[in-house]
Each structure stands twice: as C-alpha cells, then as structure tokens.
Amino acid sequence: MITVALAKGALLKDSVARFAAAGLDFSAVLDKDNRQLMVPTPCGRARALLVRNGDVPTYVSYGQAQLGVVGYDVLKEHQLPVAQLVDLGFGGCRMSVAVKASSGYQRALDLPAHCRVASKFTHCAREYFDSLDLPVELVHLNGSVELGPITGMSEAIVDLVATGRTLRDNGLVEIEELFRSSARLVGHPLSMRLDDGALTEIVTAIRAVEPSKGEA
C-alpha cells in the first residue's frame, strides 16, 4: 500500500483535490468529524498520514511515507533528503524580511550588524544573512514573530508572507524577499528508485493536472 504524508492546515484541501485528479480519494481527511491520523482510500490502494506541515519531509525521508505534499519553505528550512518531484502551484507565498514601518530601514543591508532578527525559519534566515555578510543574532520563535519588532525584542523578522495583511495590520513592512514558496510533491528517494511503476503512475498523473484558479 502506498503511503502519502499530507500536511494539516492550509495545504490539505488542495492536496486532496490534486490526488483525487490522479485517482486517489483522500476526501475522508476533510471530514470535520474525522479523528483518524491514518486514513485509507476507499479502494485500499493507498493511505494518507495526517501530520504537521513541518513533519512531512521527516516521514518521507525515513520512508514511512513514499510520497508527501509540503511547502518549499519547509524543505529549504529542514534540508532533509527527499526527492522534489512536482511544483504543485498552490500554497503560494514568499519568505521575506520585514521591519517596523517607522524604522526607516529600506533593505536588509540597512540593518545594524549584530542586531536581533526573529524567525521560525532560522536556517533560511542564517543562510540569507550569511550571503549578505551581515552578522545578526537570530531569535527562534514558534509563532507570532511580528511581535519581535513591535515589542523591541528584534529589529526585524524573517517570515512567510502571503497577502501581507498581517504585516500591515501590525505596522510592519517587507524590505527584502528571500525566495518564493509553493506546495511540492516529494518522494522517498529509495522508494522512487525501487518503484514497480505504481509511484511513477501517480506522480505522472499529478504532474499532468493543471492547477485550478482556486489553487493558484
């Protein structure tokens, strides 16, 4: 049986739709009354593991799931050995540096050396500031990173931005974009190499599906 790791939250609905177009019905995971974390398809051909977004590449890299759907931001942050198979085109956002609108900073290089930068994505942030040769102190936060500059704990943040509304509502502005992110279909490398054709069939079917307007 093929096991697919699906992230709870914002990517789930579009992930289910994409697999449905490829012939795998995981719609039961969308049932508000569902409490199962391992959900088989009605045909018994595959099963879905419902996991946190950040855990998808872990399940795939260890081979507990042969396929998974996860944001590129998570892949870049965790750097786990998974095969990136398809850019699915939904869940679009960007990783950005943001500061208080009143700070006067116009770009990342305006930030003072050794200033504090708050982020959930400290690996991505470190890689970016190292590329600028700008030493900063990174403060890891698990949520509401916007509070860093608001409270004065940090000069800036590095975080995902979709519409930018949360930043605006909290008096912050973007000054740099690190990279663009979207949902990716990933695979367990060894499983893909030893595939008898079943995984390739699914990947090919998913790749052939054009993103709907609702997904883009």
From Swiss-Prot:
Record has Magnesium as a keyword: no
Alphabetical keyword list: Amino-acid biosynthesis, ATP-binding, Cytoplasm, Glycosyltransferase, Histidine biosynthesis, Nucleotide-binding, Transferase
GO molecular function: ATP binding; ATP phosphoribosyltransferase activity
Pfam families: HisG
A single BP term in Gene Ontology: L-histidine biosynthetic process
The protein's Enzyme Commission number: 2.4.2.17
InterPro entries per UniProt: ATP_PRibTrfase_cat, ATP_PRibTrfase_CS, ATP_PRibTrfase_HisG, ATP_PRibTrfase_HisG_short
GO CC, alphabetical: cytoplasm
Source organism superkingdom: Bacteria
Catalytic activity: 1-(5-phospho-beta-D-ribosyl)-ATP + diphosphate = 5-phospho-alpha-D-ribose 1-diphosphate + ATP
Location(s) in or outside the cell: Cytoplasm
Pathway linked to the protein: Amino-acid biosynthesis; L-histidine biosynthesis; L-histidine from 5-phospho-alpha-D-ribose 1-diphosphate: step 1/9
UniProt record similarity statement: Belongs to the ATP phosphoribosyltransferase family. Short subfamily.
Function: Catalyzes the condensation of ATP and 5-phosphoribose 1-diphosphate to form N'-(5'-phosphoribosyl)-ATP (PR-ATP). Has a crucial role in the pathway because the rate of histidine biosynthesis seems to be controlled primarily by regulation of HisG enzymatic activity.
Subunit structure: Heteromultimer composed of HisG and HisZ subunits.
Domain remark text: Lacks the C-terminal regulatory region which is replaced by HisZ.
HAMAP family: HisG_Short
Name this protein carries in UniProt: ATP phosphoribosyltransferase
UniProt source species: Synechococcus sp. (strain CC9902)
Encoding gene per record: hisG
